[in-house]
Amino acid sequence: LLAEANMWPEDVREYFGDGDECHMAYHFPLMPRMYMAIAQEDRYPIVEIMQQTPDIPAGCQWAIFLRNHDELTLEMVTSRERDYMYSMYASDLRARINLGIRRRLAPLMDNDMDKIKLMNGMLLSMPGSPIIYYGDEIGMGDNVFIGDRNGVRTPMQWSPDRNAGFSRADPQRLYLQPIMDPMYGFEAVNVERQSRTSSSLLNWTRRMLAVRATSHAFGRGRRTFLKPGNRKVLAYLTEYESDTILCVFNLSRAAQAVELDLSAFRTRVPVEMAGRTPFPPIGEWPYLLTLPPYAFYWFRLAQDVSAPAWHQEDVTLQERPTLVLFDGWNSFFREQVMPWRIGMAERMREQLETDTLPRFLEIQRWYAAKGTSVRRA
């Protein structure tokens, strides 16, 4: 049983009862604050509303979403915040309706794939069950020239065929026509086309859903929001049983660096979940990450994974092996030096072969046998 109540989280809490009434309830106040955070490049709107969200009975869930079949409601924000959202996302008055914005996700993000993926990355990792509005997985657009809220309810764009593959009926008999503009039209944006492209938004969404399914921590875990000094970065931990997930999001249009206090997880190795790439282990110092514009990471803080092979605990520069020659290259050859320097030449060659060259080889990037000692070269 799903409750649709556009109210503050503490008021919606009553609909769950003791776990014997509604199983799920929409978290309406979170939706506009996710858009506000990316517009302001500040995590505060998201963190504030999540701190106001009460615990709910075990077995119940919040339903979280980026868009739905109605307007992006702005009832749960202040009048000042509402004016800001209108100026950022609905400068065209035709996009406004009631106390909200009748646009889809892709147009709201200016069809910027990095921003769309960032929003979906937050959606899929926030506490609760994510709900994806049909068409958002392929970046469908809308039609602000259609009255009421029907501009975001156009037919699903399955293929470039007639009626976007949605219906074989006469196009004139459709209740709503499919989108036909050059950027979002069904000939350019459709499931059939994106299914054949590995880098498409559709296939990216499928991969991220598959990654999410590998850990129960996403849906059932307890969230702890971190408070790094850089407010352009949103970071939180999700813990469930022995599984710990770290989610980090860059809300800015510029690259950002962030230092995270992860000392409670010292010696664990963060493994980036999409590519299964191990990062350097967590130490006693703040953990430094850099993120490209509108980028995010999901890390599993693993206890049973080794640090990457290239990682060195001692990052100080090693002293370069040095050998001072008394007679240029002739110093290595006893046949080419004065008789009274033959002993010096032999010692010089011995030092070259057993010390200088082995140490030089071991620090070269192209040397494949890392971790093994070279006795003589």
PLM-predicted stretches and their roles:
Residues 1-312:
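Active-site and adjacent substrate-binding regions of carbohydrate-active enzymes
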Residues 312-377:
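Conserved NTP-binding catalytic cores of kinases and kinase-like/nucleotidyltransferase enzymes
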